[in-house]
A protein has these predicted regions:
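Beta-strand/loop substructures that line and gate deep hydrophobic ligand-binding cavities in soluble
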Residues: 89-117
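A generic alpha-helix structural signal
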Residues: 27-31, 76, 124, 128-131
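Compact, glycine-rich, soluble single-domain proteins
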Residues: 23, 31-37, 42-88, 92
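Terminal, regulation- and interaction-focused segments at domain boundaries
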Residues: 2-38
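Sequence-level motif detector for i,i+2 pairs with an aromatic at +2
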Residues: 11-12, 59-61, 97
Length: 137
């Protein structure tokens, strides 16, 4: 795996960070980090498992939906359309070469997309640090 690398798909506001862990380890570590921060895991969607149950195959992908109503609610009150993208989400995916990535919408993209007031962007900006910590050794 190696040192965490980052990538940004600026056109769509998607940030990606390469994990130094395997897929399962990355998912578990991320779950532990959000719990330690007092955040709630609202949903864990196993796209690969769902595909398998439908008789299909796909690379490993899991979407983690998490947040805290104390942080998200003021954002949604100020910018109601932000509820389309909140709670926050992180996609953990594994590529054919075994490299594991964590992907998320950049806070700046979400702020621009929904007109989130600058004083509330901090409520969603912590995702970058969480993903960085989950990807690192």
């Amino acid at each position: 795996m190696g040192v965490a690398r980052t990538g940004l798909n600026r056109g769509q506001g998607i940030e990606r960070v390469a994990s130094t862990r395997g897929f399962d380890e990355t998912v578990v570590h991320f779950e532990q980090l959000i719990a330690a921060k007092g955040l709630m895991l609202f949903a864990k969607i196993d796209f690969t498992g769902d595909a398998k149950r439908a008789g299909l195959t796909m690379p490993r992908m899991m979407l983690l939906v998490f947040g805290n109503p104390k942080g998200g609610t003021p954002v949604m009150v100020a910018a109601p359309s932000s509820a389309l993208d909140l709670p926050l989400k992180v996609l953990v995916s594994e590529e054919a070469d075994g490299e594991v990535w964590l992907s998320f919408n950049s806070p700046e993209y979400l702020a621009q997309r929904h007109g989130i007031p600058s004083e509330l962007v901090a409520n969603i900006a912590g995702i970058r640090g969480l993903v960085g910590a989950a990807a690192a050794n």
